[in-house]
Amino acid sequence: MIPHRLFRFSGGSLPYDCVLTLRAAGPMKGRTDEENRARVFSGLGIESSRVVSLTQIHSRTVYVAQTPEDFSDWKEGDGILAGNPDIVPCVTVADCMPIWLCHERAPCFGVLHSGWKGTGIIREALAAARRVWGAEPAGFHVILGPHIRSCCYTVDDDRARYFSENFSPDAVCLDEARNQAGSVWPWRLSLAEANRHLCRDAGIPDEHITDTGECTACGSEFGSNRREGSGSFTHMAALIRHVVH
């Protein structure tokens, strides 16, 4: 049994499984951990040849996948959309947020890697979906997956200001105790709130937005840069596949 979490979009009837491998499944970084990736995908009942991945660069670059072969050169980017049900889009995360999305009418589904630098990638994904499939934001369902949350994510004044001005003032909160102690990271940052604001602003209904509510830095079952250390953290695979329920 491969240690993983399974998430479903709101309503539960959309034909997609959203999967996050856990720390115990082992490292899942593309190119580096190919043997383990093949083992894990096989254990999940997925042919490795169907999986589409990227060289992730903490960007807002989103690709539309037509065939797995289109990505054999490991394009640089952080989001994958597909309309072909044979394709399994996959990114890796460890404190950054996986965002799964699908449309309730258009044949469009995908997964995004959204850390602080890539916050806003959901906008690019929605724009691409509208351009390729004519998919309007109101028909999208979104899952904001496990990531480092404000309980563990403290930032400096510059990053707090950046999120407040570019996304939402509600994405940051001053920790008075840390501030009074003279910490250079006195602000608590909520990637979930920033992305929720982006989804709402784009026109995705609140009832279509699911937040798993889990913190990767708190939960030892997750890979976490903050908890495990930058040189030894576990990349988890976040993937989405078309299924027949």
Where are these regions (language model features)?
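Active-site microenvironment for binding and transforming phosphate-containing groups
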Residues: 1-245
